[in-house]
């Protein structure tokens, strides 16, 4: 059963109780990313959702994240890992780069959208506002803050986050890996889950838009 009014929207420059509730759930170390992991790896038919964003994440009565709105989803047949693209699907601000290259798509488009959403929740800023405005793209801004060791810029006025900068850094690193321009560099949701639960360590991410001849590894 889904909670009434249970979809929470990340709003720019504002930390409403709804936003904070969702942040508490998604940024909690025990989060298993189960909803997305399930449709990618645990269903009998693999599903690419194609429209992962905060508005499509619902919380049930136990505050467990559930995915909603499968209207744009693609089903992958047995042994199939990619699907032909029949036009861009999703929401501005969350599109993976391969949508614009007319390339075949995989579950990695959802991983990209998850990374954007994670950055939104960390920063309490909307990627859509960044995409429509004249400001630097949120993903580039977040990476620059990470590279320059200025993560505090991402969490202005968030004293709770400032009290655990090590945890914040892990979350930002995961998000940066998820938004890599090269889909082959993005981790699976299973690996994302393992890192968030501190089951495995994660390596230093490259620039999201940087292609290298020797791809780095997500796992240390």
Feature-to-residue mapping (PLM):
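Conserved eukaryotic protein kinase-like
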Residues: 1-220
């Amino acid at each position: 059963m889904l909670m009434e009014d249970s979809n929470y929207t990340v709003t720019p420059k504002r930390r409403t109780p709804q936003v904070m509730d969702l942040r508490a759930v998604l940024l909690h170390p025990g989060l298993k990313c189960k909803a997305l992991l399930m449709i990618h790896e645990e269903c009998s038919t693999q599903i690419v959702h194609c429209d992962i964003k905060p508005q499509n994440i619902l919380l049930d009565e136990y505050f467990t994240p559930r995915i909603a709105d499968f209207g744009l989803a693609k089903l992958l047949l047995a042994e199939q890992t990619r699907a032909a693209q029949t036009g861009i699907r999703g929401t501005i601000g969350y599109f993976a780069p391969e949508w614009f290259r007319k390339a075949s798509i995989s579950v990695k488009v959802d991983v990209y959208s998850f990374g954007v959403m994670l950055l939104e929740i960390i920063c309490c800023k909307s990627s859509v506002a960044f995409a429509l405005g004249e400001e630097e793209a949120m993903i580039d801004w977040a990476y620059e803050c990470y590279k320059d060791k200025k993560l505090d810029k991402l969490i202005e006025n968030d004293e709770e986050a400032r009290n655990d900068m090590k945890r914040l850094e892990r979350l930002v690193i995961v998000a940066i890996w998820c938004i890599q321009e090269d889909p082959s560099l993005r981790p699976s949701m299973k690996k994302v889950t393992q890192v968030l639960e501190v089951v495995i360590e994660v390596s230093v991410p490259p620039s999201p838009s940087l292609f290298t001849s020797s791809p780095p590894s997500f796992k240390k």
